[in-house]
Amino acid sequence: DDVSDFESVMQWLADKQPAKEVAIRLIHNDFRFDNVVLDPQDPMKVIGVLDWEMATLGDPMMDLGSSLAYWVQADDDPFMQGSRRQPTNAPGMLTRQEVIDYYGQKTGWSVANFDFYEVYGLFRLMGIVQQIYKRFKEGNARNPVFATFGPFAHYLGQRCEQIMARSSL
């Protein structure tokens, strides 16, 4: 009740959804930094991917958008820094834009209009955060950090709105 429904974000996603010619592939559907095993000799090389229980067929860039929703970089504001659960803001780590560019380079796919996928990833995370916050408010999740998930959901919605406002889509 104290977390917005973000209807404007849902409508924007519906209106801006990429054309149907998207390449459908097997996607992990929970692809994020803490679900990969990196080569200790070459940290740009993934040698394992964990937790495949949510895998499905879909647009592979949705995996990237979802992954980057969790990606906190060094120049993010204090609120986002406080949400960090992965070492993505450590010195030498790629920024979100550098990850997007690297992905485009490695796949050969255009990442020019990535705003849709970035908003999608943030919106997806917002839904997860709202669900956990609701369980916390009802007494079904007790971790005190979950008390911050209501404000965090609002923050994610504001980030969506900022991306939507500057987007050329």
Q: Which stretches of residues belong to each language-model region?
A:
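Active-site activation/catalytic loop segments of kinase-like enzymes and analogous catalytic loops
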Residues: 62-107, 121-138
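Short, structured helix-loop boundary elements
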Residues: 3-10, 61, 146, 150
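All-alpha amphipathic helical-bundle segments outside canonical DNA-binding/catalytic cores
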Residues: 110-121
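Catalytic activation segment of kinase domains across protein kinase-like and atypical kinase folds
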Residues: 37-79
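An alpha-helical support segment within catalytic cores of ATP-dependent transferases
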Residues: 1-29, 39-45, 104-108
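Short beta-strand segments
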Residues: 26-32, 48-50, 118, 124-127
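Regulatory N- and C-terminal appendages and interdomain linkers associated
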Residues: 127-169
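Generic structural signal for small/hydrophobic residues in well-ordered secondary structure
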Residues: 13, 31-34, 64, 126
